[in-house]
Amino acid sequence: SRWINPPYGGFFIMDISKLKYNKLPGLTSAFEPVIYDCPYQDKIADPLLQWIYDRANVRVNGGALKTKFYTGNDRDTPEHTILIDWIESLVVEAVQGMSRWTNSAYNESPDSSKKFKLADYWGMYYDQGGGAVLHNHWPYPISFGYYLKTPEGSSPLIIDGESIQVTEGRLILFAGHQSHEVPECEISGRCMIAGNISYKGVTDW
């Protein structure tokens, strides 16, 4: 894999030379996931983990447990605000990296239109045997996973067939149309917050 460091410490992990459509423009070209390590993990982890333990009671297709959906304006704890504000502060840079191989008109748009907002999020708890079947988050343009707890043996996140090992305190941002899955976990305790980000563009909402 090729590792390229953007200015604020994130990095790209995919080797686009292995992708079937890597020389084609648009949605058939490679959208590279971008990874950041959160400087606030030690401060926010315990309250957010407890929030998931208390609310993850819906069994998803694949076996994992999830909370209900929350909007980006829902901040049940101060730690939610810390995490959401941090994620939103990174999105413009991350999208610039993700879109660089896509021939997207976004790359030529003015900086004043490059505005994003965290649209929704939910907590996930993976007990032994729990996973998530192959799916995507389209029509959201950007999706993310933030990993709060990843015991040894935790299943990776697989995006477009590429396996990304998850690590505590790590944020993975990727294009919402990208198919992804989590294999059945061999152990219990894998916890994360997933969500989607909307592109505001020149709108005022």
Feature locations, PLM:
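Short, Φ-rich (hydrophobic/aromatic) sequence segments
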Residues: 47-53, 87-91, 143-145, 195-198, ...
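Intrinsically disordered, low-complexity segments enriched in serine/proline and basic residues
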Residues: 6-7
